C-alpha cells in the first residue's frame, strides 16, 4: 500500500517538474537572444562611431546638394520647355508659310481658270492637277519625239527625196508630173527655161521629189501667198537627206548670182 501511494504521489508531482523545466529552458533561450541582439546593436554602434566625421558630413552634403539640384533643374526645365514650345511654334509657322507660298506658285502655272469667282484649289487638288499636267506634257513630248523620229528616221523616204529616175523622157512629161518641186530649184528651173534650154530632163533629182508627209500641217498663209505645194514642208523643216545636202551638179553653175538675187527679191515681194 505504501509503495502504491508513493508511486501515485510521484506521478502527480511529475507535471510540475516538467513545467518548471520548460520555463527555465525558455527563459534561458530568451536571454540568449537578447544578448545576441545587444551584441549586434553594440557592434553597429561601434562601427558608426568608428566612421570618420568627414564621410558623414560628405554624405549629408551630397544629399542636400541633390535635393537643391533637383529643385533648380525643375525650375530650369519649365523655362526650357517654354522656350522649346516657342521655337517649335515658330518653326511650324515658317514651314506652313513656305508651303503656302509654294502652293500659290504652283497654282499660278496650272492650266485652270484664275479669277475672284474661281474657288481656290486645295493643296491635295493642286498636287493631283500638277501630277496629271506633268503626265500629259510627258506623253506629248514622247509623241513629238516619235513623230520627229519617223520624219527623220525610217519613214524619211515617205515624203522626201525618193528614188532618182534616170530614164530620159520628154520635157512635157517632167513638167506634167504630179510630184512637187523644191521652191528655190523650181524657180531656178523656170527661169532657166526662159533664158536657156535647161529642162527637167537634165535635172533628174528635181522631178522625183515626193509629196509632203500627211502628218505635216498645211501653211496658214492665204491663197495669194502660196508658194507652191512643195513649200509647205521646206518652209518648216530643213531637209537632212543626202540628196538635199549634197552640192549642186556642175550644170547648175550656169545660174548666175543675178538670177538668185532676182529669185529672192520675187519671194520677198510675194511674202509682203
Swiss-Prot record:
Region feature Disordered, mapped onto this chain: 1-71
Q: Which residues form a coiled coil?
A: 68-89
Compositionally biased intervals (Low complexity): 1-14
Q: Where is the bHLH domain?
A: 83-137
- For bias kind Polar residues, which ranges apply? 36-46
Q: Where in or outside the cell?
A: Nucleus
The record ties this protein, via SUPFAM superfamilies, to: HLH, helix-loop-helix DNA-binding domain
Annotated Basic residues bias: 24-33
Q: Which domain of life is it from?
A: Eukaryota
Question: What is the recorded function of this protein according to its Swiss-Prot or TrEMBL entry?
Answer: May determine the distinct specification program of class A neurons in the dorsal part of the spinal cord and suppress specification of class B neurons.
Name the UniProt record assigns to this protein: Oligodendrocyte transcription factor 3
Designated gene of the protein:
OLIG3
Amino acid at each position: 500500500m505504501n509503495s502504491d501511494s508513493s508511486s501515485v504521489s510521484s506521478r502527480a508531482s511529475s507535471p510540475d517538474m516538467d513545467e518548471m523545466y520548460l520555463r527555465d529552458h525558455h527563459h534561458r533561450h530568451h536571454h540568449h537572444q537578447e544578448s545576441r541582439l545587444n551584441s549586434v546593436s553594440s557592434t553597429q554602434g561601434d562601427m558608426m562611431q568608428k566612421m570618420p566625421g568627414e564621410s558623414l558630413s560628405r554624405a549629408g552634403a551630397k544629399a542636400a546638394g541633390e535635393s537643391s539640384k533637383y529643385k533648380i533643374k525643375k525650375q530650369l526645365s519649365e523655362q526650357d520647355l517654354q522656350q522649346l514650345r516657342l521655337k517649335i511654334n515658330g518653326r511650324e509657322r515658317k514651314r506652313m508659310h513656305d508651303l503656302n507660298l509654294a502652293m500659290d506658285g504652283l497654282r499660278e502655272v496650272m492650266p485652270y481658270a484664275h479669277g475672284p469667282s474661281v474657288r481656290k484649289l486645295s493643296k491635295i487638288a493642286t498636287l493631283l492637277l500638277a501630277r496629271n499636267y506633268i503626265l500629259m506634257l510627258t506623253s506629248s513630248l514622247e509623241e513629238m519625239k516619235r513623230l520627229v523620229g519617223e520624219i527623220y528616221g525610217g519613214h524619211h523616204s515617205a515624203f522626201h527625196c525618193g528614188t532618182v529616175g534616170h530614164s530620159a523622157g520628154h520635157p512635157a512629161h517632167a513638167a506634167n508630173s504630179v510630184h512637187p518641186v523644191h521652191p528655190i530649184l523650181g524657180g531656178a528651173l523656170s527661169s532657166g527655161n526662159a533664158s536657156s534650154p535647161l529642162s527637167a530632163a537634165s535635172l533628174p533629182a528635181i522631178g522625183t521629189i515626193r509629196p509632203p508627209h500627211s502628218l505635216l500641217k498645211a501653211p496658214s498663209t492665204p491663197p495669194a501667198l502660196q508658194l507652191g505645194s512643195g513649200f509647205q514642208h521646206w518652209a518648216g523643216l530643213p531637209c537632212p537627206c543626202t540628196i538635199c545636202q549634197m552640192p549642186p551638179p556642175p550644170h547648175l553653175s550656169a545660174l548666175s548670182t543675178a538670177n538668185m538675187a532676182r529669185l529672192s527679191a520675187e519671194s520677198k515681194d510675194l511674202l509682203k
